[in-house]
């Protein structure tokens, strides 16, 4: 049907009959042929098969860990998810790119509406077929144009079913994409193992910054291990102003300034983040602040509690994975992207499993038996994926507000006299993120500090 519609498009410069100029302009823009130069490309799995296809991205060679996702939609969100850093992403969906790539538009909070980070994070893209003609009202460029602009190689015309079958049977493997030339498949130096790289250091913020809620009800510290934009949005939209810290920031030293601590998702092996694990352990020893972790944050919290993590054979990357809530018996369809899991048998006695994966029985969450601390391996913020478990953010924010109320009862001046740390952080409002509100916060904090000093 779409092909018949494309054939019906008038020649360049001619008008669509009975269509106003605005709609005509949009139609011409969204169905134009977005062609990028095609060259021979090769996808090589180390000690495995070689696949030949065509390049539709950047003219460069790359290597990394080959993983696959069974998600049907959401490729702009997946490819910008920092958790995919260093990985070559293979899509099982036969056709990718048919709705193009949207703009870097931001929402009322100053957060990206359609992407999970400002740049494409995956090392490479592998698809069976790529749509050169795209059609969607938010699209501004094709998938090939986007990959080329971001410097990411991409290959189409390969048997992704055979690739995924190999990865499922042999496990996630090192691989490479070469464009325009071929290398000896036996040269190990041509393969880079991202697991040997501290990937979190690459994607974490380099300095703290602040994002204000329109009507702030609480203040949450976010440990950024590669946080997704929609996680920040899920917190801010629920009335939490957030201050985002680098992954290795000594959060236990400033936790008393906040009503809650959140640990984000991120890429790579959780055991690389030893500083983060130490700071979280000290945080749980010295503070009763509510804590919530997602994905890598879940794994880091488990390590801090004394548990261990394990590497899965080929990971879980999809938007339709069932997870069972062990406290209610309810099943949630979840969005997941991880290659490691918590070894539930190593959880300390004061913790218990929260969710379990119904496909492979791996751990999907844990919760403390007596304190407001819990975490999930899956992504309740989705983007893309279902929102079955988004209520977990409500549970967390409720615990944060209760903690704030209890602290206010014991320390009435806690919120009226801002600390020098918070005044400084509020001055570092994230660029492009509600600068007016941020400035109001800075001015209010400065005024309150002046009144307190005068008294």
From Swiss-Prot:
User: What are the entry keywords?
Assistant: Amino-acid biosynthesis, Arginine biosynthesis, ATP-binding, Glutamine amidotransferase, Ligase, Mitochondrion, Nucleotide-binding, Transit peptide
Q: Which InterPro entries match?
A: CarbamoylP_synth_ssu, CarbamoylP_synth_ssu_N, CarbP_synth_ssu_N_sf, Class_I_gatase-like, CPSase_GATase1, GATASE
Question: What GO biological process terms are annotated to this protein in UniProt?
Answer: 'de novo' pyrimidine nucleobase biosynthetic process; glutamine metabolic process; L-arginine biosynthetic process; pyrimidine nucleotide biosynthetic process
GO CC aspect terms:
carbamoyl-phosphate synthase complex; mitochondrial matrix
SMART domains cross-referenced by the UniProt entry? CPSase_sm_chain
The principal localisation class reads mitochondrion
Protein name in the entry? Carbamoyl phosphate synthase arginine-specific small chain
In which organism is this protein found?
Aspergillus clavatus (strain ATCC 1007 / CBS 513.65 / DSM 816 / NCTC 3887 / NRRL 1 / QM 1276 / 107)
Taxonomy, top ranks, is:
Eukaryota, Fungi, Dikarya, Ascomycota, Pezizomycotina
